[in-house]
A protein has these predicted regions:
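Asp-box/WD-like beta-propeller blade repeats and closely related beta-sheet repeat scaffolds
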Residues: 82, 99-138, 146-151, 171, ...
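Blade-loop segments of beta-propeller domains
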Residues: 65-91
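Short loop/turn segments immediately following the C-termini of beta-strands
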Residues: 58-60, 98-100, 106, 148-150, ...
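Beta-strand-rich domains and repeat architectures in extracellular enzymes and scaffolds
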Residues: 35-60, 258-265, 281-282
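Conserved beta-propeller blade signature
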Residues: 53-57, 92-95, 142-146, 193-197, ...
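Surface loop/turn motifs at the tips and blade-to-blade linkers of beta-strand repeat domains
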Residues: 35-41, 74-79, 120-127, 174-178, ...
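Beta-propeller domain segments
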Residues: 19-28, 132, 149-152, 157, ...
Length: 358
């Protein structure tokens, strides 16, 4: 991202947050409601603390914020390098910058006066192209970290992967390769398999390739980048002499250039039972397509056998014609079962709730 664009988005976020947002334009299934939960400049990745504090990373703002359950916002870290990723584990907040991971211990004990982040790992690549990180802890306590490709399409060792950091040994290991730029992943609540989004490459036209929702049933898989896209489309440069059958296909093709970022399996109790263990995806929206697409929260549904049966819109309306007034980034399930959605363009956190009879 250029400095000009980053400044423009930051300015837009501050402006939008200061003005009422046209939430009446957001279309949701019957019974659902959306509201602004908090205003947070350049709100990006989300993580929930044990006491219900919602931590919010940023990309262009250089700061990390905390939103108390009542909606009050605190700045807990500043002056950082693209602190997009946040994760909470054993009472501590973990922050991912471009090239390092830092930690703030016992952060919820005194949220108004927190300690300075302490670096725990500083051997990540320093390239800023796809250099902002999403982080999340696996069920077995490993900190998973993606390393995006430092390009639109290229073959570089040590990039285009998802790996994990062992907090005790400080050893980083590769889990999966062939991933252009993942900015969201989660583990299936029952199978514990890793699922993740991946942003497809640019400049192959409006309709190619699709962004991907991928399932890593085990480690060691290769998902195709830069040789093959969307499971069936060889790259015009890097795909020569390679077959897409060599690689793991996507579990679901998403829209082309929708910029699928955060994803969550819904495990709350507020929404109807049909949403349990289904996947919500934040689609940030296209930037170089002749007709814009994305700018919504989508829903991937499974059938009773665990196979994907549909990919559809859940919340849409941030895109009006060719004008977008918001860009969803990440999602988190709050303690009451409602769904928090970050928006870095509008500079807010939304709360989507459900009540029968609405």
């Amino acid at each position: 991202m250029s400095r000009f664009l980053a400044a423009l988005l930051s300015s837009a976020a501050i402006s939008a947050a200061a003005q009422p947002l046209p939430l009446e334009r957001i279309q949701l299934p019957p019974g659902f409601r959306i509201e602004v939960f908090a205003s947070v400049p350049n709100a990006r990745s989300l993580a929930l603390g044990d006491k219900g504090t919602l931590f919010v990373g940023s990309r262009s703002g250089g700061a990390v914020h905390a939103v108390a359950p009542g909606g009050k916002v605190f700045k807990v870290a500043d002056g950082l390098s693209m602190p997009n990723g946040v994760a909470f584990h054993s009472g501590a907040l973990y922050i991912a910058e471009v090239s390092r991971i830092s930690r703030i211990e016992d952060i919820e004990k005194n949220i108004e006066s927190v300690k300075k982040p302490q670096t725990i790992y500083d051997r990540l690549p320093s390239e800023v192209h796809h250099g902002w990180k999403f982080i999340r802890f696996s069920p077995d306590g490993k900190l998973y970290i993606p390393i995006g490709a430092p390009c639109n399409a290229c073959e570089r060792d040590g990039y285009g992967l998802i790996g994990f950091l062992d907090l005790k040994t400080k050893v980083f290991e590769v889990h999966s390769k062939g991933i252009r730029n993942s900015v969201g992943f989660d583990w299936h609540p029952q199978t514990r398999e890793l699922w993740f989004t991946d942003n497809g490459r640019d400049w192959l036209g409006d309709d190619l390739p699709a962004d991907e929702l991928n399932r890593a049933a085990r480690g060691g898989l290769h998902f195709g980048f830069p040789f093959c896209h969307q499971g069936d489309t060889p790259d015009p440069e890097f795909g020569r002499g390679r077959k897409c059958a060599e690689f793991e296909p996507p579990a679901q093709k998403l829209g082309p250039h929708v910029a699928a970022l955060g994803m969550r399996f819904y495990t709350g109790s507020m929404f109807p039972a049909e949403y349990r263990n289904q996947i919500f995806i934040a689609e940030h929206g296209s930037w170089n397509r002749s007709k814009k697409t994305g700018y919504r929260v989508s829903l991937v549904r499974f059938d009773s056998s665990g196979k994907i049966k549909s990919y559809e819109a859940f919340a849409q309306g941030w895109l009006q014609g060719e004008t977008a007034w918001g860009r969803p980034v990440d999602l988190e399930i709050l303690n009451d079962g409602s769904l928090a959605v970050s928006d870095d363009a509008a500079g807010v956190i939304y709360r989507i709730s459900y009540a029968s009879g609405r």
